[in-house]
Amino acid sequence: MIADNKAIKKRIIELQAKLNIIFPQLYIDFLAKINDGDVYEVDDSGICLYSYSDLEERNQTYQIKDFEPNYFMIGQDGDLGYFINVGNPTDNSIYSNDLGALGSLEMEKESNNIFDFIGQNEK
């Protein structure tokens, strides 16, 4: 991770406007700390979290908005996707679901926020 980057935060705000969604603040803070274009791997877990520049393409590829309109995919581990709730931007929780079962299975809460999810205690 790198220090907060104002240029990246500006691009995140532009992405939110383009997609007409609002990310939870702690997730914005996380995105601003990782390098653009880098995939953030959670230790050696196989879980990869996308940088802001990959988010739109990944969500389009998996048609997330069609199947889970209140959620936005932020990463994955094989067929398991990780999501934030953009239907409630005050919800900082991280959720998961099988990418082949979107829309038919309930989202499963994995963590209270992105920093707990990656094993860091920051805000």
Please annotate each region the language model reported.
Residues 81-109:
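Segments surrounding the PLD/"HKD" phosphodiesterase catalytic module and close analogs
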Residues 1-88, 122:
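A surface-exposed partner-binding patch
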Residues 102-122:
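Compact, glycine/acidic-enriched structural inserts
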